[in-house]
Every structure is written in structure tokens, then in C-alpha cells.
Design a protein with these regions (language model features):
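Membrane-helix entry/capping segments
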Residues: 1-23, 53, 112-113, 147, ...
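Membrane-proximal extracellular/periplasmic loop immediately following the first transmembrane helix
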Residues: 51-104, 223-229, 455, 459-521
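Alpha-helical transmembrane segments
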Residues: 31-65, 306, 355-364, 437-466, ...
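Interfacial "coupling" helices/loops that link adjacent transmembrane helices in transporter permeases
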Residues: 297-341, 711-751, 757, 770, ...
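Alpha-helical transmembrane segments of integral membrane proteins
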Residues: 1-22, 270-276, 304-331, 335, ...
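Mid-to-C-terminal secondary-structure elements
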Residues: 118-141, 150-281, 357, 444, ...
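Short, strongly hydrophobic transmembrane alpha-helices
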Residues: 18-46, 50, 296-298, 341-345, ...
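Small-residue-rich transmembrane alpha-helices
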Residues: 39-42, 302, 338-407, 450-451, ...
Length: 820
């Protein structure tokens, strides 16, 4: 034990005597370990950590999909209450099965109206998720039936905001929409609903009410508005559950074809949907990137340690000659590396804490509850493992070198292994490795940058600048039919168009990147397609000037008019009294008419109640973002919308327009609440956010990698020049010109750089395929990107070479020859 303590003291004294070396190593490691720990902290919290539910591996979602429709909007559909009831009755593979729905309702508090996020949940939802009331109680099965008192369970956040945690909250009455509810319980603060691969399904409701409160008319039973969750019985696999649900779906297709023909059930686990696929892959790519950065740091430090070992070769030789033994000397160097790594890891945790806060400040998309992301035991264990790994990586080569020290040579000239060809080769190999790894990271970052540039350049098909959006939802009790809805939106448009700074206003229920929806349709006068070949298109019910406001050009035919709006709404009131008109986009014309003329063709919506005649074809845009391309679209003039988006074109500040819109709506209906008024650019930013986040972080890591590689080249080349001062002096003395000296230094430096570039290009070709799903309109092996990345590394390399080269050219031969 005394020997170990003594060795530890000697090692610490040695590091104190070389502060520049120790501080440089600790700083580099703190940065490398810090960013690794930061990314792992997020990865662990978001992807690796178990979900906060009992036996989360047995929890699944149940959805429906059309078997023969390849449209993302129809691949993960919610289900109708009628089907949910049949699943609950017939399925034998589930221990529990529950359903829920998200919405918002207006609440009147002290005469003021505010919007409240409301969850409609079945009585078995909370037991399924292992939730218990913090105070009071949760729903009972009997409260789901009709005729029972309206009860509510509130979130902890709402308990604080609305009732200031007063115990009188239990039993208090709250008015939501047209109903009064009695608060019976409060959920614990840690309760959270599961994430899904469709962001809109995630619920962080302020208030929960029984599921039965969602269904007010018999027609509501067939509306697909429920997300179903279930817990598999112990020992039941997801495949077995899928097989049983397929059988139930087939039975429902026969017994209830109007609702279920052509449908199947899709089962997916909570764990698979806890993070979006894009975020999941992005975090693993970023973790791989920072691990490469760590390897570059280790190579850099290994080179520094080799330089230090060459300077200490005489000391090491004396220790070996005095009987310390080669193994003990090697152990001393490994202990030194371990101490440096330990200090770097401790400081790295501080860097990680700061880096996590900085990364979360960038508001990475799809990360739910970022406030729960923190360094925990798992992260500390990771940091310790990284510290041990780095000690081995950058301490092993010098330790092996020490074990092969030429004792006689070191004692005679102080050169030892430090001046040998072996050390030079090792340094060059490490430089080549640094350059190769830096090129891999730079190539990945360049691919992401080009991809993001393509995404921004492609856009959604029209300019979103100066467009402001406000969502308006009309309560059924005060607006019971299409006529009352149309009257409201007519009046709203008329008033908003007269607001200062407004150059145009329109209404739509199908807004790009926000509220895209699709439906099946029919061609009037043609046979209905079979259920396995449905005709699908996006339906947008808009005011006539919607496309003009977006500045989308007409390609053929004519634009919509106010007369078209009047005729279409009249046809909706009385289908026998005439027909409406509509526009289609170019993608619709290509898909369904090919060489035919679409003008004059008649369409029927899915319920076949309303017919419309095509009067024009408009240019395409990409409603679900550039990655998803254009979609077939139908535009009907109609203001008969229960919920719609008001779109305003204005050059005025958003806050001023928002205030004007809210005052206008308040003047029309005091009980309507406009929660958010946002620029359409906001939705574009959200759509681009994940790629922007990935590109930014990967670019930062690539930049750090390149700086470390340049620092490595500089340190090695400086040492080469310093160790060859006598040789250079002799060359100058016998007539070598500065150009020849310069070429000698350049050859010494650029050989490992060139080797690193070759290896890096090969590695980039092999590894860039892992980025393929994150790229847009650029291939993972894009030759231009690979070439430019290699040229970039080659172009900045002279910055690391310049100072050592100047030193070599400035050597005085007389001074050099007088040195030993």
C-alpha cells in the first residue's frame, strides 16, 4: 500500500512540475468527456431510460389503418368508440385496455374565458398507467355511464395555477364548455401521458373527464377520435396480440362493413413510440460523433505524451537502470494518464452540465419534459467508464514505448526511444488517425448542411412570410349548424380585413404543416372503386381567396369567387338545388386524369352528400413538408367549419395583429378564446427544427474535431523541428537552401495528413450510409461533398504547419551546430 501511495505522490509531483502539459491534457479531456457525457445524458433520459409505468414493455397502442392505402395519414388512424367497445369485449390477450382523446374547452373563471386542455379518458386509463390520485380519487367505472354526475380529475399544474393548492379544490365546480364538473381528485406531479409517434396524440391535459362526456350524439360513436392503449397479459407477445387483433378486425369488417371494411389493426409498443424515429436516430448519430471527437482527443494527447516521454527518456532510463523495472515505469505512465483522465472527467461533468443546459436551450424538437433531463447514476457510470477508456487509449502507447527504452542510448545522449524512428512512426500514425476521424465528422456535417440547405430551398411551395395564423373553434351549442358557422366566419373575415395593416384574410380547415387532413372521394357518374382501391385526396374547405392569399398561381381554368361560395354552401343545404364547384391541384390532375381534361369533372365527398364540379387547376405545394412531396388536393369554397384557421396577410408585427384578432373575436363572441396567434413561419421553423438541430450540433462537433486535429499536427511538427535543429543546422551549413528546408518540413507534416485523408475518405464512404434517413436530396456518398470536405481539411492544414515551418527556416546554423 505504501508503494502505491508513494508512486501516486511521485506521479502527482511530476504533473505539478509540468503544468502546461497537465493543464492542456485535462482541458482537452474535459471538453471531450464533457460533450460525450452531455449527449449521453440526453440519450439516456430520452431513449434508454425505462418509461415511468409499471412493466412498460407490456404497454402497447392500438390503431387502425386502411390495408390498401399507402398514405401516411391513413397508416396510424385513431378508432371509433364502437370498435373500441368491441375490442374490449372480444380481445383475450390484454390485461387492461383503455381509450382517451385530447381536446380543449373554454373555462369561465371570474367572468373571464380561458382555454383549458381537456383529456377524455376511460375509467381504466389511470390504472393501466399505474397512476394514483395525489389527493381525492380517480374515476370509477360507473361514472362512465350516462346519467351520472359530471366529475373531473385535475393535473398538479392546474391545481397550482387554478386553485393555488387550496384543499377546497376537492369538491369545487369548474365550468368547461357547456358543462359543470365537480373536482374529485388531483394527479401527482410526476404523472405524464405516453408519447406517441404522432405528436398531436400526446396529452398533457389540465383536466380529465370521463370518456362518455365526449359522445353527445349517436353519430359520435363512429367518429375515429380515440387513441387506445392496452397492457399485454404476462407471457403474451406482441406478435400473438397482433394475430388476435387481425382476426377481430376481419370479423368487424364482416359485421360492420360501413365502418370497418378494408381496415386492419396496428399494434405498436409504448417503448417504440417514446421518441420519434428522427430524434432516436439523431441522438445515436450525435453520440457516435462525440465518440469520434473523443478518439481524436485521445490521439492528440497520445502525441503530447509521446513528446513528454521523449523529453523524459533519460529519467526513465535511470529509473530502469536503478532497478525500477520496465513494467513499473510503464505503470507509472499509465497512472499518470489515469490521474489526468480522472481530473478531466471531473471537470468534464461540469462541462456536461453546462452543455446539457445549452443544448436544451436550443429547444430540440420532440424531447418531452426536458426539465427531467439530468445527470444521474447511469451518466456518472458512463463518465467513469469514459475516463478509464481515455486513460488506456492515450496512456498505452507511451507506456509501451517506455517498456522498450534503449537504456544505454538514453543515458548517453538523452534520446532513447523518444528520438527513434519508432516514436516518429507512432506520431505520424496518430496524426493520420486524427485527420481521418476529423474528415469523417466534417463529411457528416457537410452532408447535413447540404441537406438542410436543400430542405430550406425546396420549402413547402409558397412564401410563408407575412402570414399570421389563428385557430378558431366554435362550440356546438351556440353554433349548431353549418349556417351559423358560415355566418360567423363571414363576419369575422369582413372585420379582420378592415384591421390596420391587414392586406388580406382567409379561412381554411386544412393548413399546411398544421392541420392537414385527407379523405376518400368518388367521381360522379363513374363506378365506385373497390374498398381496396380507395381514391384519396386532401380536402380543404376554404374561403374563395385562400389560394390567392397564398399567391399560388392558377394553371388552367379559373379561380374561386364569392358566387361560388354562395352556390356551394347552398348545395350543401339542399343537394338537389344544385352543385358546388371546386379546384384541384396539379398533383391531383396528374394522378387521376393523366391525359384527360379535369375541368368540368364532378366529384363527391366520402359521404356522397355533396357534389362539386372542377373549375380550375392550381399549382402544387407540399402541405406536409418537402420530405413528403406534393399531395393530391381538392379545394372547396365553404365556411361551414366547426374549427378552422384564420390566415392573415400583414406586414404589421404579429403582436399587434394578434391583439386585433382577439379583440375582433371577443367583440363577436365573448366566450370564444383565441389561444395562439402565430406567424406561419413558426410552423415552418418547427418543421425544420429537427434537421436544424442535428446540423448545428454535428457542425460544432466537426469544427472541434478539426481544431483538435490541427493542434495535433502543430504539436507534432513543432517537436519534429525542435528535435532536428542540429540536423537542419548541418544541412544549412553544407548549402541547403530555405526552399529545401521547407520541403523537408512539409514532407514530414503532409505525409500523415495525406494518409489520413485517404483513410478518412474510405471511412466516410463506409459510415455515411448511417446518415441516409436524415438526408434530403443528397446522397450519403455524394462525391461533391466528399471532395469539398477533403479539400477543406487540406486547405486548413497549412495553418498548423506555418509556425513550425517559420521556425525551421529561421534556424541559425552556427547556433544549431553548437548544440549537443
Amino acid at each position: 500500500m505504501k508503494a502505491i501511495v508513494g508512486e501516486l505522490r511521485r506521479t502527482l509531483r511530476g504533473l505539478v512540475k509540468a503544468p502546461s502539459y497537465a493543464l492542456t491534457c485535462i482541458s482537452v479531456l474535459a471538453l471531450a468527456i464533457g460533450v460525450n457525457t452531455a449527449i449521453f445524458t440526453i440519450l439516456s433520459s430520452v431513449v434508454l431510460k425505462a418509461l415511468p409505468y409499471p412493466t412498460p414493455s407490456r404497454l402497447v397502442f392500438l390503431r387502425e389503418r386502411f390495408i390498401h392505402v399507402s398514405d401516411p395519414l391513413f397508416e396510424h388512424m385513431q378508432t371509433a368508440r364502437r370498435n373500441y367497445a368491441e375490442w374490449k369485449r372480444s380481445a383475450t390477450v390484454f390485461e387492461d385496455i383503455a381509450a382517451f382523446h385530447q381536446s380543449s374547452l373554454n373555462e369561465i373563471v371570474n367572468g373571464d374565458t380561458q382555454s383549458v386542455a381537456v383529456g377524455f379518458g376511460s375509467a381504466d386509463l389511470f390504472p393501466l398507467l399505474g397512476a394514483h390520485a395525489r389527493s381525492g380519487r380517480l374515476f370509477q367505472p360507473a361514472e362512465e355511464g350516462a346519467g351520472h354526475d359530471a366529475v373531473a380529475v385535475i393535473s398538479d399544474e392546474y391545481f397550482e395555477r387554478r386553485f393555488h393548492r387550496a384543499p377546497t379544490a376537492l369538491g369545487a365546480s369548474i365550468t368547461l364548455g357547456d358543462s359543470i364538473y365537480t373536482v374529485i381528485g388531483v394527479l401527482p406531479p410526476q404523472f405524464q401521458m405516453p408519447s406517441t409517434d404522432e405528436g398531436e396524440d400526446r396529452i398533457e391535459a389540465d383536466v380529465w373527464v370521463p370518456l362518455s362526456r365526449l359522445f353527445k350524439t349517436p353519430g359520435d360513436e363512429t367518429q375515429r377520435q380515440l387513441l387506445v392503449a392496452a397492457r399485454l397479459k404476462p407471457g403474451v407477445s406482441q406478435a400473438r396480440a397482433q394475430a388476435e387483433m387481425n382476426g377481430i378486425a376481419q370479423s368487424l369488417a364482416k359485421s360492420d362493413p360501413d365502418l370497418n371494411e378494408g381496415l386492419s389493426v396496428v399494434i405498436s409498443s409504448f417503448e417504440a413510440e417514446a421518441t420519434s424515429p428522427d430524434l432516436h436516430q439523431a441522438l445515436y448519430v450525435l453520440q457516435a460523433a462525440v465518440l469520434l471527437l473523443l478518439l481524436i482527443a485521445c490521439a492528440n494527447l497520445a502525441n503530447l505524451t509521446l513528446v513528454r516521454a521523449s523529453l523524459r527518456s533519460r529519467e526513465m532510463a535511470i529509473r530502469i537502470a536503478l532497478g525500477a523495472g520496465r513494467a513499473r515505469v510503464a505503470a507509472h505512465l499509465l497512472l499518470e494518464a489515469l490521474l489526468i483522465s480522472g481530473a478531466g472527467a471531473i471537470l468534464g461533468l461540469v462541462v456536461a452540465q453546462w452543455a446539457v443546459k445549452l443544448i436544451l436551450a436550443l429547444k430540440p424538437p420532440d424531447i418531452q419534459r426536458p426539465e427531467t433531463i439530468a445527470i444521474d447514476g447511469t451518466v456518472l457510470a458512463f463518465a467513469c467508464a469514459i475516463a478509464i477508456l481515455t486513460a488506456a487509449l492515450f496512456g498505452l502507447i507511451p507506456a509501451m514505448a517506455a517498456s522498450r527504452t534503449d537504456i544505454q542510448g538514453a543515458l548517453r545522449a538523452g534520446g532513447g526511444w523518444g528520438a527513434s524512428a519508432g516514436r516518429k512512426r507512432a506520431s505520424q500514425v496518430l496524426i493520420a488517425a486524427e485527420v481521418a476521424l476529423a474528415l469523417v465528422l466534417l463529411t457528416g456535417a457537410s452532408l447535413m448542411i447540404r441537406s438542410f440547405q436543400n430542405l430550406v430551398a425546396t420549402g413547402i411551395g409558397f412564401q410563408t412570410a407575412h402570414l399570421v395564423v389563428a385557430d378558431v373553434a366554435l362550440p356546438e351549442k351556440r353554433y349548431p349548424d353549418g349556417a351559423s358557422e358560415s355566418k360567423f366566419f363571414h363576419t369575422l373575415l369582413d372585420r379582420v380585413r378592415h384591421l390596420p395593416g391587414v392586406s388580406g384574410a382567409t379561412v381554411t380547415d386544412n393548413l399546411p404543416l398544421h392541420s392537414v387532413s385527407a379523405s376518400n372521394f368518388f367521381f360522379a357518374g363513374r363506378p365506385d372503386p373497390p374498398r381496396n382501391a380507395l381514391l384519396i385526396a386532401d380536402f380543404a374547405h376554404t374561403s374563395p381567396d385562400y389560394l390567392a392569399l397564398l399567391r399560388l398561381p392558377m394553371l388552367t381554368g379559373r379561380a374561386l369567387t364569392e358566387a361560388d361560395l354562395e352556390a356551394t354552401e347552398k348545395a350543401a343545404e339542399d343537394p338537389k338545388g344544385g352543385e358546388g364547384v371546386c379546384l384541384v391541384n396539379q398533383a391531383f390532375a396528374r394522378e387521376f386524369f393523366k391525359d384527360e381534361q379535369p375541368i368540368g369533372q364532378r366529384l363527391l365527398e366520402s359521404d356522397k352528400k355533396y357534389a362539386c364540379r372542377i373549375v380550375g387547376v392550381v399549382a402544387d405545394y407540399r402541405p406536409m413538408g418537402a420530405e413528403n412531396g406534393v399531395r393530391a388536393q381538392i379545394f372547396r369554397p365553404s365556411l361551414r367549419n366547426r374549427a378552422a384557421s384564420l390566415v392573415v396577410r400583414t406586414a404589421a408585427p404579429t403582436d399587434a395583429i394578434a391583439s386585433g384578432i382577439r379583440k375582433t373575436v371577443y367583440g363577436m363572441d365573448r366566450d370564444l378564446v383565441i389561444d395562439k396567434v402565430q406567424p406561419l413561419d413558426h410552423w415552418v421553423d418547427d418543421w425544420q427544427a429537427q434537421r436544424r438541430f442535428n446540423t448545428l450540433l454535428l457542425s460544432v462537433f466537426a469544427g472541434l474535431a478539426l481544431l483538435l486535429a490541427l493542434a495535433g499536427i502543430y504539436s507534432v511538427l513543432s517537436n519534429v523541428v525542435a528535435s532536428r535543429v542540429r540536423e537542419i543546422g548541418i544541412r544549412v551549413a553544407i548549402g541547403a537552401r530555405p526552399r529545401q528546408i521547407g520541403m523537408l518540413v512539409l514532407w514530414q507534416s503532409m505525409t500523415p495528413v495525406a494518409a489520413g485523408l485517404a483513410i478518412g475518405l474510405a471511412a466516410s464512404l463506409a459510415l455515411s450510409r448511417f446518415l441516409e434517413s436524415l438526408l434530403f436530396q443528397v446522397g450519403p456518398r455524394d462525391p461533391l461533398t466528399l471532395t469539398l470536405s477533403a479539400l477543406a481539411v487540406l486547405a486548413v492544414s497549412p495553418a498548423a504547419i506555418y509556425i513550425p515551418l517559420r521556425r525551421a527556416l529561421a534556424i541559425d546554423c552556427m547556433v544549431a551546430l553548437r548544440e549537443e
